[in-house]
Amino acid sequence: MPDASEIPPPPPGAPGTQFLCLTICGYRRPGMSEEDYRHHMTQVSAPMTQDLMVKYGVKRWTMVHNTSETRALMSRLFDHQMTQLADFDCFSQVVFESVEEYRRMKEDAWYQEHLVGDHEKFADTQRSRMTLGWITELIRDGKVVKGTQ
């Protein structure tokens, strides 16, 4: 079994087309409304974060907010295989090439001063979960693709 600190090799493909994706399955701070949570993430936190992410090589950053309304739509998709509804409030995905660059961003003095404390204003950081994996892109803009760009 490989050492957990070792970065696994990317899947086969052209250099510069293999990206890692950090997926954060987030919960909002207890007592915070869905509307306030989304507003803080998109209108307060994102504007403070996005330029720093670009500086450190982030290729893409998306947020998917799961609201009461969108969760209700899931009943239309359930079948014998899709039966379990995830209870996360948001899925935030950050795409980058280098774990080291992302770590450097988190160690940046500006990040430490402005963003670490901001997370506590909207997120339940003790319940939120995360994972990291290689992206395999199959369809983009309605077309079958070979590789991530």
UniProtKB/Swiss-Prot annotation:
Annotated signal peptide: none
EC number: 4.1.1.-
Catalytically driven reaction(s): atrochrysone carboxylate + H(+) = atrochrysone + CO2
Pathway given in the UniProt record: Secondary metabolite biosynthesis
Disulfide pattern: none
Key words of the record: Lyase
An example Gene Ontology molecular-function term: oxidoreductase activity
Xref: InterPro entries: Dimeric_a/b-barrel, EthD_dom
EthD domain segment(s): 30-125
Keyword Lyase attributed: yes
Function: Decarboxylase; part of the gene cluster that mediates the biosynthesis of agnestins, dihydroxy-xanthone metabolites. The pathway begins with the assembly and cyclization of atrochrysone thioester by the non-reducing polyketide synthase Agnpks1. The atrochrysone carboxyl ACP thioesterase AgnL7 then breaks the thioester bond and releases the atrochrysone carboxylic acid as the first enzyme-free intermediate.
Family: Belongs to the tpcK family.
UniProt-recorded name of the protein: Decarboxylase AgnL1
Lineage: Eukaryota, Fungi, Dikarya, Ascomycota, Pezizomycotina
